């Protein structure tokens, strides 16, 4: 395994390159720089060899949100809806950089993320056909209007595999929006399965902040199998 790092389009990229040619390329968006921990967890789980591109997203509320939504709390930050602009950078600059550096040609590209990045991973499927496998771990499917968006629009290409997961305590809250997370995740899982997409849904123990790296690795592992 060889690791290469660069800052491109304002984002820190870490590319863990497979030794073999023509291995899959997994694109993983992280809140800060936890990509290496997720990659090491994948290795511990004896995951099939892959190229792993970790992208640290620092303007999380903007770049991972598909449209504007108010803050979840009085002191919180609003979601400003910059996902389309970020996706353009991903497709036009970041992915070409990674593709030039892997051995051979990726057998497939998958996209994965946790929390708001899990929502972005699904959103991207409606905007581009580059990715053929997608995983949203503890995805922010409480996001206002997202469930409806998924049902009212068509993916650019139906994925070969789709993975969703959530912690069993994540919806145990009085917050009127956040408490819809498990219900919305399960409803979307049922909807995607009805489209004939090979889907897996996993209910993990704990709240939103428990075993994050392990949950991410489990989801990515499903894409690689």
Range-by-range predicted roles:
Residues 141-213, 217-224:
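The feature captures the conserved acid-bearing segment of alpha/beta-hydrolase catalytic domains
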Residues 123-127:
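Active-site signature of alpha/beta-hydrolase-fold catalytic machinery across serine-
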Residues 112-117, 121:
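Gly/Ala-rich beta-loop-alpha elbow adjacent to hydrolase catalytic centers
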Residues 28-30, 137, 166:
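Alpha/beta-hydrolase
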Residues 22-101:
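Serine-hydrolase catalytic machinery in alpha/beta-hydrolase-like enzymes
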